[in-house]
Amino acid sequence: MSAASQRVDAFGEEAGYHKGLKPRQLQMIGIGGAIGTGLFLGASGRLAKAGPGLFLVYGVCGVFVFLILRALGELVLHRPSSGSFVSYAREFFGEKAAYAVGWMYFLHWAMTSIVDTTAIATYLQRWTIFTVVPQWILALIALTVVLSMNLISVEWFGELEFWAALIKVLALMAFLVVGTVFLAGRYPVDGHSTGLSLWNNHGGLFPTSWLPLLIVTSGVVFAYSAVELVGTAAGETAEPEKIMPRAINSVVARIAIFYVGSVALLALLLPYTAYKAGESPFVTFFSKIGFHGAGDLMNIVVLTAALSSLNAGLYSTGRVMHSIAMSGSAPRFTARMSKSGVPYGGIVLTAVITLFGVALNAFKPGEAFEIVLNMSALGIIAGWATIVLCQLRLHKLANAGIMQRPRFRMPFSPYSGYLTLLFLLVVLVTMASDKPIGTWTVATLIIVIPALTAGWYLVRKRVMAVARERLGHTGPFPAVANPPVRSRD
């Protein structure tokens, strides 16, 4: 092996990872990865705000989420990588793009982790036994447990995510069965008849007009966040070419049944005015039919969803930070890998930031905390847009005969990609129009963009030095945006 080849291998992003995720774990991550508090808890407030037509928003967003996943699937089968779309951004658009999207995605999960630890503590304190325990201690315990699971090995992460996803899926299936029985049998719920007549008696499909439906779109998009995790996880499976197409194609049924189906069923069983923000819509339904233990059971489910989200956040940021650290865009310690194949540096960095959030929560910052939650949506929009842009670049290069697309492809490309980018732009605009929190959230870009720019000038010498050592490669693959540098050996 030449000295140049040795240097390329030394900077390979996948070096040290263990292919430890089992097919059943990846399949369940694909099934339950996007089912979280955005559905179990957030759907209630959105129903109350937008009315029964909310299920259409979930459906439209679901179509674009599927297209984003198909774009990611094509990229993964082009080149499996645990660095996911950060690695692809480097390959197709260069080091600046990888730096920017890597830190934006890190921002997304760091903010989400702060919210998740606080949510876990809040859910635990709904049970009397935990009310005597300070909230920050509960949050710290939750973070310690999930952090430990992530640091041990990828198998432990996969097992925790497998069982968390299973609990969420079983809970939704139980609701779908019971709700369908009430709907099919025309049994009244809380004195109201069920079915389409319920909509006619309460203002129709759009009782609050179409504007609230647009406003809640950003929240629905956030509810779908983490679907891209299946692409990151595919980099740590032995046979991604067999597992990925099945996991991604099954998303159509998942979205139709679990998201669109659940929200439509909720709207057909009770008036939209019966739901309220802060209470799970599933608890509302089961309480109305006399099942008063529903609150405790659903609290277990939303607690599981928050634990799952925290678990996914630590896992994902560890891999993303490792990828950008290998290029010199992040602190060197975030590139460190344990003997068990865990990029612990990035995971620990996220945990430290989450600890800061736990302490901050003690001061009850009010709306500032909501802005933290919304800021994570900016990161996910940036990440999803990057996936689509990279797929469009791959499509263009394939047409030029420079690269070859895999057999598993983004349907209707490139037009589906252009339409998806337009959709993400509309989501950003609707977020900005959601006063005051959404407006302030988008306004934070005035701080974020200069901060990213300043950060780039701090690290660019190191990044370019690493790029020269890589010989213009991403691992063993040429970075088409950075032509190979001629070896001086």
Curated annotation (Swiss-Prot):
Organism domain of life: Bacteria
Transmembrane segments: 25-45, 49-69, 100-120, 137-157, 162-182, 210-230, 255-275, 289-309, 344-364, 369-389, 413-433, 439-459
InterPro entries according to UniProt: AA-permease/SLC12A_dom (IPR004841), Amino_acid_permease_CS (IPR004840)
Membrane-related topology note: Multi-pass membrane protein
Keywords, comma-separated and alphabetical: Amino-acid transport, Cell membrane, Membrane, Transmembrane, Transmembrane helix, Transport
Any GO BP annotation: amino acid transport
Family named by the database record: Belongs to the amino acid-polyamine-organocation (APC) superfamily. Amino acid transporter (AAT) (TC 2.A.3.1) family.
Name the record gives this protein: L-asparagine permease 1
Source organism per UniProt: Mycobacterium bovis (strain ATCC BAA-935 / AF2122/97)
Name of the gene this protein is made from: ansP1
